């Protein structure tokens, strides 16, 4: 419901005068965290031969085109002759190398790069000559080298801070001052639980922070059951989780939520990341009798399913397998393996054959339905199985009756329908299972077309790609268990780095490696590479792959705890804050924004787990879906956390999407953070935020201890920010309240736009309406929607 125009004008004019700013107005002076640059725009100004070849040669001699019959993606293809009789590269002999002749010839028709491409500079030509003369050494890409722990640092410094400070000192920079205790506590709660501290937590934990007991505060927050919800949302972005199947029909996945709940429980239990990952990759092989292990494999069922008429079932199956391969590459390897589906990777040493060897791990996996849901003990499991056997016996009896007595046909058919509609939520769920018979052959698909298998290359057996020099000896029988073991081998160069980079991005506002889903040869080496390598080595060894230990290590550092305040000098020397001389300031995610608004208003239902719920959604969006099914939940379900909101792929909640929620079509490592006018309008006019503002105003009026405007304003700030408003803030906001109060008193016809029906019957309705308007403004403040 929209606010009356005049009230909006009063509220915004006052905000502009006071400088508090709503989401639409500037988003704060320093703004949001810098967006990671794309792989295509990575900086290759380093004086290396690889960057020279990537910049000038790979477009014609990469994994796609391979003109002249050779590629410059790696050294080996250049050591042959390609389509010519002259070797492309002869280490130590530039004069015998075709590559050298082509870059330095005066013949324009022969010179490379061609005329329509930027030419090599004199320095670059000399670099290539010197490189060949010195033996054509090809250094390994930094991300393909195993992490090195580096040298020991002073034990007096936090290990994260010691490595950050070393780089800052080299650059002549200093870290920022510590954040205010209220800012730090709010930051910790938003980062670790996605919620605000309660009144008791504000009081108790601020007292602990004042005594310097940060570790105990962190431990208590990590122990919250809401930790699992917060970090499950991050993981579900990578798992491309949704509650519907996609495509035109976009039918409901009735059991999708069971995987989501498994992830929440796994993070709360702090299952080590290697075990957490292995169960998702191969739970049906690792522990086939364990219902929880089978539930974990539902990550592979987050693909889209096409239920349209007339489709080719095999084409749809292959698309799902390909989606799983690409998800594994993005989530665990941080490599764009999908580029090799149709041809060799354009710029990474990852061939098309490598892709289909990887695909072979998943090509013999089928979906299976079993009774798995909520079976905490053997007694309940046996009860479910007995019921299943009873129903099977009943079904067989009815079938026999149907065969012998035609007069019972209608009755039997009706009974059969009832049996087949047996409540699926009582245990039946889909999961993955490796097929043991009639196994499918995996072939390289020409141009990625499932109808064009390259039979000449033979069957692609399951195999892992060589990453750098890391290629362990496979066992006799290779399956998804080996894939999981390979990913978490001691010397694997990517798995720990890739995940830690994303965790750092969630906690510091931007990752150490700017391309979190592409650690390939175009990924810039991070300025804090030694920190990334040290954390990777520490996490695998001492941290035991524990997510909570990793988070504890980061958030107890001074680097995490420093202020995010703007510093003019830093904006000149490090505008993107790549060196982390300050914290980053950014808008909270879509779900968190809704959650904290409902929490502050007292409406938020904090129940954990269960089927998806249906908050109010615009009818015009509902009509976009094929089924047009969306009946708003009632009672507490209407105000559950955003994690539990039903997500339909073809008609997602626009209030999620306007705040950069991913569309679940592909794995998303880190969300973007945009700033646009629609966001302010969504908060101002969305039905849920309107109800939150009404409830927040009512919550203030229900507190009999609050007698004055200043006391109520103070309580608002205490709930939202853990502090009282400053004198300047109060002087700016209270006149706004007075102006709104005067307007509502003079225009009683507009009270219904601000009040719930129960409020309109109260005395002093215009007074309460003014507080509803102010509550809506507070929920739209940049300070409220921003994590500092």
Predicted ranges, named:
Residues 113, 247, 269, 297-443:
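Active-site histidine-acidic residue metal-binding/catalytic motifs
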Residues 13-31:
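Bacterial N-terminal signal peptides
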Residues 32-166, 182-187, 197-202, 244-245, ...:
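Solvent-exposed helix-loop boundary motif
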Residues 155-186, 191-192, 196-226, 241-288, ...:
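Primarily short, surface-exposed interaction patches in extracytoplasmic proteins
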Residues 774:
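Short, surface-exposed polybasic-aromatic patches that bind anionic ligands, especially phosphate groups
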Residues 1-14:
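N-terminal secretory signal peptides that target proteins for export/translocation
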């Amino acid at each position: 419901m929209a606010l009356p125009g005049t009230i909006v004008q009063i509220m915004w004019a006052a905000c502009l005068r006071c400088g508090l700013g709503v989401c639409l107005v500037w988003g704060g002076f320093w703004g949001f965290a810098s967006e990671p640059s794309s792989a295509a725009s990575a900086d290759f100004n380093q004086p290396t031969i690889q960057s020279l070849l990537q910049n000038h040669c790979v477009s014609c001699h990469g994994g796609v085109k391979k003109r002249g019959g050779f590629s410059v993606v790696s050294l080996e293809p250049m050591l042959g002759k390609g389509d010519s009789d002259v070797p492309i590269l002869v280490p130590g002999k530039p004069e015998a190398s075709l590559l050298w002749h082509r870059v330095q010839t005066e013949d324009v028709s022969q010179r490379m790069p061609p005329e329509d491409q930027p030419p090599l500079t004199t320095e670059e030509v000399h670099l290539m000559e010197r490189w060949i003369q010195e033996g054509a050494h090809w250094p390994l890409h930094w991300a393909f080298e195993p992490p090195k722990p580096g040298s020991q640092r002073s034990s007096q410094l936090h290990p994260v801070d010691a490595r950050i400070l070393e780089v800052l000192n080299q650059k002549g920079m200093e870290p920022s001052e510590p954040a205010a205790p209220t800012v730090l506590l709010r930051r910790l709660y938003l980062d670790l639980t996605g919620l605000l501290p309660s009144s008791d937590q504000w009081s108790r934990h601020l007292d602990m922070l004042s005594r310097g007991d940060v570790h105990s505060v962190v431990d208590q927050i990590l122990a919250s059951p809401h930790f699992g919800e917060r970090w499950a949302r991050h993981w579900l972005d990578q798992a491309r989780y949704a509650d519907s199947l996609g495509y035109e029909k976009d039918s409901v996945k009735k059991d999708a939520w069971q995987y989501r709940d498994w992830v929440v429980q796994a993070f709360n239990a702090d299952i080590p990341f290697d075990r957490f990952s292995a169960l998702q990759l191969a739970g049906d092989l690792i522990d086939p009798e364990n219902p929880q292990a089978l539930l974990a494999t539902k990550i592979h069922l987050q693909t889209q399913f096409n239920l349209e008429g007339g489709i080719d079932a095999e084409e749809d199956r292959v698309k799902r397998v390909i989606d799983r391969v690409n998800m594994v590459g993005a989530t665990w390897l941080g490599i764009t393996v999908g580029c090799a589906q149709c041809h060799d990777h354009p710029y990474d040493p990852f061939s098309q054959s490598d892709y289909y060897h990887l695909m072979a791990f998943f090509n013999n996996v089928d979906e299976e339905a079993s009774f798995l849901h909520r079976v905490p003990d053997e007694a309940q499991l046996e009860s479910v199985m007995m019921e299943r056997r009873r129903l099977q016996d009943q079904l067989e009896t009815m079938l026999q009756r149907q065969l012998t007595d035609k007069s019972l046909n209608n009755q039997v058919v009706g009974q059969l329908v009832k049996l087949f509609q047996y409540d699926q939520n009582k245990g039946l769920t889909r999961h993955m299972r490796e097929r043991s018979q009639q196994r499918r052959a995996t072939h390289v698909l020409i141009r990625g077309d499932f109808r064009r298998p390259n039979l000449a290359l033979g069957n692609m057996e399951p195999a892992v790609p060589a990453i750098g020099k890391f290629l362990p000896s496979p066992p006799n029988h290779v399956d998804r268990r080996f894939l999981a073991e390979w990913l978490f081998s001691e010397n694997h160069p990517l798995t720990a780095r890739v995940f830690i980079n994303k965790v750092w991005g969630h906690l510091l506002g931007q990752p150490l490696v700017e391309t979190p889903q592409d650690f390939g040869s175009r990924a810039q080496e991070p300025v804090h590479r030694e920190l990334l390598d040290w954390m990777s080595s520490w996490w695998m060894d001492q941290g035991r792959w524990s997510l909570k230990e990793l988070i504890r290590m980061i958030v107890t550092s001074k680097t995490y705890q420093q202020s995010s305040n703007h510093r003019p000098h830093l904006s000149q020397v490090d505008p993107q804050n790549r060196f982390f001389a300050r914290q980053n300031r950014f808008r909270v995610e879509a779900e968190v924004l809704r959650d904290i608004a409902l929490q502050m208003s007292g409406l938020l239902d904090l129940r954990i787990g269960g089927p998806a719920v249906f908050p109010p959604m615009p009818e015009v969006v509902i009509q976009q879906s094929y089924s047009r099914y969306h009946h708003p939940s009632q009672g507490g379900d209407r105000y559950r956390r955003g994690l539990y909101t039903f997500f339909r792929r073809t008609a997602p909640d626009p209030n999620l999407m306007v705040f950069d929620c991913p569309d679940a079509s592909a794995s998303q490592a880190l969300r973007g953070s945009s700033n646009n006018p629609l966001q302010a309008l969504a908060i101002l006019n969305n039905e849920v935020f309107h109800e939150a503002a009404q409830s927040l105003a009512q919550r203030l009026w229900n507190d009999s201890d609050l007698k004055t405007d200043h006391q109520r304003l103070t309580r608002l700030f205490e709930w939202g920010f853990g502090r009282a408003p400053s004198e300047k803030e109060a002087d700016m906001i209270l006149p706004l309240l007075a102006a709104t109060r005067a307007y509502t008193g003079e225009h009683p016809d507009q009270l219904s736009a601000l009040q719930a029906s129960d409020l309109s019957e109260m005395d002093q309705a215009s007074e309460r309406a003014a507080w509803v308007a102010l509550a809506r403004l507070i929920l739209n403040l940049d300070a409220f929607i921003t994590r500092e």
